[in-house]
Amino acid sequence: MNMKRINKRLNIRLLTALLGSLVLFSLGCTKKFSTINTDKNSIATVTPAVIPFLFSHAEDIATVNQANYQIAQNLFADQYAQYFGCEATYFGSDRLVINQAWVGANFNPYYTDVLPQLQTIFANTDSLSAEHAMAEVVWVLAFMKATDYWGPIPYFKAGIVADSVPYDPQDKIYADFFSRLDGAIAVLTPLAGSNAYGTNDLIYQGDVSHWIKFANTLRLRLALRVSNVEPTVAQTEAEASVAAGVMTTSPGDDGLIERSSVGGDINGLSTMSDWNEFRMSATMASVLKGYQDPRINQYFLPTFNSGDPTFGVFANYTGIRNGLTVAEQTIPQNLAVANSHQGQRWSSTNVTVGGTVVGEASYTNTPQNVIETAEAYFLRAEGALKGWNMGASAQSLYQAGITNSFAQWGVSATQAATYIASTATPIAPGSYTEDGTDTAVSNVPVAWSADPTMELRQIMTQKWLALYPDGMEAWADYRRSHVLPLYAVIHSDNPLITNTSTQYLRRIPFLLSEKETNGGAVAAAVSLLGNGYPDNEMTPLWWDTNPY
């Protein structure tokens, strides 16, 4: 990254901070709703020159920046999706305990640092402009993350100063998501080839053509999310997305947000490089090693104990089971030095194996995944299994998803072709288990099956691998489909989960801070969960129709 670009990013962050007094002045000093609600009727009028900086800040927070990453995502969704297992004895989240003081980091920032910025853009741009439409897409991206944790959230009246702000049901929120995306895509499509926000857009540098693909792929993601509860809507939105143009080529189409140590906005996973609190999960070890998946070299490092910095020696990669007790975490086999650290691109130069530095000086600047091309293909493959018009067969889309994921991570097309033809299945990872058993996490092969049930499992398994390290999306997929290859958590310290083979976390309960400051609205929101369900982590979201 050249100095001109670095200075540009620094200026973005400095100006955004200065704009806090301009835009965030409207934060309502309400007695309730955690004092984070804003009044959209008093949003400042700003000059056109300011708008791009507001967009940058909204993008930054909507994609979970480093300030919130660990406590918004890594301690929760990343472990629920079993990308990582926990090494730190002071965290209970891997044993399914939800710390309410942490998880608000995936709630409050959307109302304090995304909503006011985007509402200011809406109030100060033409509704038919690319700037306005791109802001609509970021809005959906942000609030999707919130509603997919909690279900009902303050939404339609968020931004209006009031003593109490009501929660809205998830089905209505998703309907608004589709409305916003449909409208944004309609505005952006005739503007293809133009530019909005320029380098202040941290994902595509203002390229509207790429934003059209991004918006359509996001719409396709949401369509599959609701496919079990609103199949007609899902098919309509999915087919419209594919017809209008989703991502097709990695890495060119991939949606990655820039991160930089300049301005303090580094990659969230990189932030944790030297803390040694998390390692590759046994689930990832079972699948990646069983498939002889070359992406393991990108996702993780050889164990420190191996003493061998050579990438690609599968025996040198090890993972830990999720849900270890404090005593089990201290067993030599489960120590951080005996299990695989996050990959090279997220590792500092303090990280060494066998005395060789395996980290990168630029690790803080590693772009952060938002939506990638491979996901678009796996979404289409799943839609094709349902009989939707996805433009190709489920098999060809599945294989294209693998090929594009390999391309994203710099693995050759030749290696992808060999992998696609492989009949390999996951293996026993050799990780600690309480009862001494050591079995493969699943029997799902890579090579396309003739069994439709197995085909869905294949699509979801490869999608799970391709989404790494986006635990938020992977956890949502698990709850929706229940076919991902996950081990039962070894121990639960959560009294609601007494059998981890049949029970799993399905949502985050409403925040205690919200119950204290917006209590009436939260009490009313419980009924929005439906079917008389209580406000706890075993209650399914609206789009999660799978029984345990």
Which residue stretches match the model-derived regions?
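Short acidic (Asp/Glu) and glycine-rich catalytic loops that position anionic groups and cofactors
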Residues: S34-I36, V357, G436-V441
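Beta-strand acidic-aromatic groove motif in beta-rich domains, primarily in extracellular
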Residues: A67-F76, P152-I153, A234-Q235, G471-A476
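C-terminal functional modules
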Residues: F406-Y548
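Sec-dependent bacterial lipoprotein signal peptides
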Residues: M1-G28
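Membrane-proximal, proline-rich intrinsically disordered regions
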Residues: C29-Q82, P109, P116, N124, ...
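Structured, solvent-exposed acidic/aromatic patches
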Residues: P48-A49, Y83-A413, S449-M454, Q462
